[in-house]
Swiss-Prot record:
GO cellular component, one term: cytosolic small ribosomal subunit
Listed HAMAP family: Ribosomal_uS2_B (MF_00291_B)
One Pfam family it belongs to: Ribosomal_S2
Species assigned in the record: Tropheryma whipplei (strain Twist) (Whipple's bacillus)
Lineage: Bacteria, Bacillati, Actinomycetota, Actinomycetes, Micrococcales
UniProt similarity note: Belongs to the universal ribosomal protein uS2 family.
One GO term (biological process): translation
Protein name in the entry: Small ribosomal subunit protein uS2
Compositional bias (Polar residues): 250-259
Annotated stretches, region: Disordered: 233-287
NCBIfam families: rpsB_bact (TIGR01011)
SUPFAM superfamilies the record matches: Ribosomal protein S2 (SSF52313)
Length: 287
């Protein structure tokens, strides 16, 4: 058992039980990942879970401290295996997410994206007043709103650039990683055996194709965010923003000492039912 801040973080058994150690076939690999690979078995690489533990410990500290100082996290995972996990875990701790498709310039041209967010909210308000438009206009606006929600629903409340990114599959999300690099935004990411570790500041070697692996690691990241939120609101009241209602509920769900629940991997309770899908504004997450 590895410990951090008095809480159990994760175990090698957690990682193995969730298939985090499985890499790609030996034909699909990045030589820069050599230091994170333990061995080869049956034509596939086995990742070194000791390196994964080190990556998790370092990343959790950074995420917790960043959120405690007021930073926000953008969760990114648009591959089918990651969509529901990203939506669920980011929503659980009130963070932003992209789970459908990354829009080029979302970070580097955020001022333009912000205008689209304003437009989305205008359309939502206009939809409540059916008397100001014809049925045809309502249909056109409805389609525009659906498109905006599909692309930007997960960042509807993002008013500034995130302090860090959590990325599932840096190869697929290469544009997002590159935009973050240009802006100096740190990236925490799952790195499979075919990824480039030089592109991220906080690599966590792991299987980025397995739903169980993605859920375990993303859940750990979300728990680190939750711990950071608790620490943020332990600061002097004059130095922090008023606590949002969802943050009050998060604190109330902890124990009497104010600690968040332990990060225990496979024993983590799930919030809601994945089979029910995302919230209404994100009902088209899947391709």
């Amino acid at each position: 058992m590895f410990w951090r801040g008095g809480l159990p973080l994760v175990t090698i058994r957690n990682l193995l039980d969730n298939g985090v150690h499985f890499g790609h076939t030996t034909q699909r690999w990045n030589p820069k990942m050599k230091g994170f690979i333990l061995t080869e078995r049956c034509g596939s690489y086995i990742l070194d879970m000791r390196e994964t533990i080190r990556g998790i410990v370092t990343a959790v500290d950074f995420i917790r401290d960043t959120v405690a100082r007021g930073g926000e996290v953008l969760f990114i995972g648009t591959k089918r295996q990651a969509q529901q996990v990203i939506f669920k875990q980011a929503s659980r701790v009130g963070q932003h997410y992209i789970a459908h498709r990354w829009l080029g310039g979302l970070l580097t041209n955020f001022s333009t994206v912000s205008k689209s967010l304003v437009r989305m909210k205008e359309l939502e308000e206009a939809r409540l007043d059916d008397s100001v438009s014809t049925k045809k206009e309502q249909l056109i606006r409805g389609r525009e709103l659906q498109k905006l929600r599909r692309s930007l629903g997960g960042i509807r409340n993002m008013t500034k650039l995130p302090a860090l990114l959590w990325v599932v599959d840096t190869n697929r999300e290469g544009i997002a990683v590159e935009e973050a690099r240009k802006l100096g935004i740190p990236v925490v990411a799952i790195l499979d055996s075919n990824c480039d570790p030089d592109l991220v500041q906080f690599p966590i070697p792991g299987n980025d194709d397995s739903i169980r692996s993605i859920e375990l690691l993303t859940g750990i990241v979300a728990d680190a965010v939750a711990q950071g939120l608790v620490e943020r609101h332990k600061a002097p009241q004059d130095d922090i923003e008023p606590m949002a209602e969802w943050e009050k509920q998060l604190l109330q769900s902890g124990d009497s000492s104010g600690e968040t629940r332990p990060i225990s991997g496979t024993d983590r309770p799930l919030d809601g039912d994945l089979s029910k899908g995302p919230a209404p504004q994100d009902e088209e997450l899947s391709d």
